[in-house]
């Protein structure tokens, strides 16, 4: 099963395909604080878990919207883009023009969102994407599968976040409807539009064929997920080139697969005085500090927005009382008091209007805080999670490098010990031979040792011959591993020669692996360094936009409130 198959897995309903009451719909999200705007991917504990995460279990059935019968007049009948357009040249021209607009923050726009019927006859909420004069409609599940695909295709790139699926508990409430829950859909539409534009700002994503196919109305997304390059992705990106995981070399399959237990600590790596290690360690510590700042900030912003909403609700009720009280002058029929009561009524009415303006301004300000500061801080938190995922991948590639480097050093040391043992044996033999010529006693001892050694070798060969027919290849490898742990001077000359030949062959393969992993790690360092630098620039630009919008919204709020109270004061002064 394709883990990104989205047409059978309608976007959001875990009860689809069952007899549950809400099997055909999803639940509305409340207007209050929401912790589920962005998905936070878990950082895998080992490469084995990383491999398993790519082969996830079959997702639960979900539905974008109730599959109810809707009149064609009221339904937004968006046909799948491949049925509307059949013009690859037009798309290529538009996308080429789009690439030249990299500085435009809103190159790609989601111009509308609503119910549509796909080519399979299913109703779902679709998001109409417009760019360069071409329109394509995609569902939320297709956005989600696009992001998952990009994470696997570009493991060294920080992929922008998208809004998460709604939690299951919220499906127990009112089903989400394209016409009734406009605010919720607009929020997701805004976040998905931001996701596409953030992707477009990243050169590696912008130029990737999968992202271009997502924006091309001629491609069915289900077919894209079942064809290369997505369909030929390896189960474990650690055993593939980091910049092009769909084209692994045979040597990549020989690389070790590290786990968390074998990972080196930052202190050990920094102790090597490697400039890149120190640099990436600084990146990691900066992200941790940044996260420690953003998490309480996001919580505080939600609290402030909640307080402003409570304040606006109080103003709404208070303004209604003042407006009702201003109408009470009709009970006075005395002509002498009529003009005075009329001015009093006007002053009360203006006061009520000022309170109403404060109420409306507070609502607008609350919405502005949610869009700029709250959503912005959540998005940056998710970017930090994604950056940590990328750094985690680098740590595993780095562990592969050090594992191979350490293994090569051990093999070289063993070969040197074996060869030195041979030289020592030769020197010892020459010394004994020289002494034997001068001393008959030494000659007798050497002759006795030679006979014992010959008898021992003959006996060993006979014993091994008895068990050779029943021995398995594993037994041979076991004996080899035992002999590799034996001190060199305890081995015979033939055993040392065999072991040296074997180790030299292993060393050839290890050197090839070392050259490969060295190249991979260099590519990972360059790509991640560039990606993290871009993230840092994005954070600076994001904070500038957030504070500029926040200052503008605060100024507009105070200005509207001030003008309304000035008008009310003029009416009160005339009483």
Curated annotation (Swiss-Prot):
Give the membrane topology, semicolon-separated if more than one: Peripheral membrane protein
| Compartment list | Endosome membrane; Endomembrane system
Q: Does the keyword Protein transport apply?
A: yes
List every stretch annotated Disordered: 30-66, 467-486
Please tell me whether the keyword Protein transport is annotated for this protein. Answer: yes
Biological process (GO) annotations? autophagy; protein transport; retrograde transport, endosome to Golgi
Q: Which Gene3D superfamilies does the entry mention?
A: Arfaptin homology (AH) domain/BAR domain, Phox-like domain
| Taxonomy, superkingdom | Eukaryota
**What residues does the PX domain cover?**
101-221
One Pfam family per UniProt = PX
Q: Which terms does the record give in the GO molecular function aspect?
A: phosphatidylinositol-3-phosphate binding
Positions bound to a 1,2-diacyl-sn-glycero-3-phospho-(1D-myo-inositol-3-phosphate): 139, 141, 165, 188
Q: Name one GO cellular component term.
A: endosome membrane
Alphabetically sorted, this entry's keywords are: Autophagy, Endosome, Lipid-binding, Membrane, Protein transport, Transport
**Where in the sequence does UniProt note compositional bias of the Polar residues kind?**
41-55, 469-484
Q: Matching CDD domains, A to Z?
A: PX_SNX41_42
Tell me the domain comment.
The PX domain binds phosphatidylinositol 3-phosphate which is necessary for peripheral membrane localization to the perivacuolar punctate structures.
Function summary = May be required for cytoplasm to vacuole transport (Cvt) and pexophagy.
Which family does the UniProt entry place this protein in?
Belongs to the sorting nexin family.
PANTHER family given in the database record: SORTING NEXIN-41
Q: What is this protein called?
A: Sorting nexin-41
Record gene name: SNX41
């Amino acid at each position: 099963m394709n883990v990104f198959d989205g047409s059978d897995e309608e976007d959001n309903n875990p009860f689809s395909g069952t007899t549950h009451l809400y099997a055909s719909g999803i639940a509305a999200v409340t207007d209050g604080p929401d912790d589920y705007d962005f998905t936070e991917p878990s950082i895998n504990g080992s490469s084995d878990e990383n491999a398993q995460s790519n082969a996830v279990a079959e997702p639960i059935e979900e539905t974008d919207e109730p599959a109810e019968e809707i009149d064609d007049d009221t339904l937004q009948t968006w046909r799948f883009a491949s049925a509307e357009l059949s013009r690859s040249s037009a798309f290529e021209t538009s996308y080429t023009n789009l690439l030249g607009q990299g500085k435009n923050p809103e190159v790609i726009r989601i111009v509308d969102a609503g119910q549509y019927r796909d080519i399979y006859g299913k109703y779902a909420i679709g998001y109409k994407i417009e760019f360069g004069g071409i329109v394509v409609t995609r569902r939320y599940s297709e956005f989600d599968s696009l992001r998952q695909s990009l994470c696997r295709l570009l493991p060294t790139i920080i992929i922008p976040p998208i809004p998460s699926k709604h939690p299951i508990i919220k499906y127990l409430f009112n089903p989400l409807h394209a016409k009734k829950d406009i605010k919720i859909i607009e929020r997701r539409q805004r976040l998905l539009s931001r996701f596409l534009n953030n992707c477009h700002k990243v050169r590696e994503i912008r130029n990737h064929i999968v992202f271009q196919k997502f924006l091309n109305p001629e491609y069915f997304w289900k077919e894209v997920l079942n064809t290369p390059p997505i369909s030929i992705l390896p189960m474990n990106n650690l055993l593939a080139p980091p910049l092009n995981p769909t084209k692994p070399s045979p040597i990549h399959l020989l690389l070790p697969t590290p786990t968390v237990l074998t990972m080196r600590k930052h202190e050990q790596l920094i102790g090597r005085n490697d400039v890149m290690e120190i640099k990436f360690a600084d990146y990691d510590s900066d992200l941790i500090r940044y996260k420690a700042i953003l998490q309480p900030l996001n919580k505080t912003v939600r609290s402030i927005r909640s307080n402003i909403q409570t304040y606006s609700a109080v103003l709404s009720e208070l303004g209604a009382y003042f407006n009702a009280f201003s109408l009470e002058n009709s009970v006075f029929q005395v002509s002498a008091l009529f003009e005075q009561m009329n001015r009093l009524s006007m002053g009360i009415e203006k006061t009520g209007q000022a309170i109403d303006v404060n109420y409306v301004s507070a609502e607008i300000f609350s919405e502005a805080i949610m869009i700029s500061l709250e959503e912005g801080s959540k998005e940056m938190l998710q970017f930090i999670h994604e950056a940590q995922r990328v750094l985690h991948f680098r740590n595993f590639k780095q562990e592969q490098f050090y594992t191979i480097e350490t293994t090569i050093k051990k093999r070289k040391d063993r070969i040197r010990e074996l060869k030195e043992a041979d030289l020592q044996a030769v020197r010892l033999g020459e010394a004994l031979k020289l002494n034997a010529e001068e001393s008959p006693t030494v000659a007798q001892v050497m002759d006795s040792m030679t006979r014992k050694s010959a008898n021992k070798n003959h006996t060993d060969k006979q014993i091994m011959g008895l068990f050779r027919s029943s021995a398995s290849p594993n037994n041979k490898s076991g004996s080899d591993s035992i002999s590799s742990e034996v001190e060199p001077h305890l081995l015979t000359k033939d055993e040392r020669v065999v072991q040296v030949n074997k180790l030299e062959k292993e060393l050839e393969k290890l050197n090839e692996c070392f050259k490969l992993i060295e190249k991979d790690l260099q590519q990972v360092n360059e790509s991640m360094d560039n990606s993290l630098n871009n993230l840092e620039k994005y954070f600076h630009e994001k904070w500038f936009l957030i504070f500029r919008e926040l200052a503008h919204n605060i100024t507009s709020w105070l200005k509207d409130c001030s003008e309304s109270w000035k008008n009310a004061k003029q009416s009160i002064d005339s009483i």
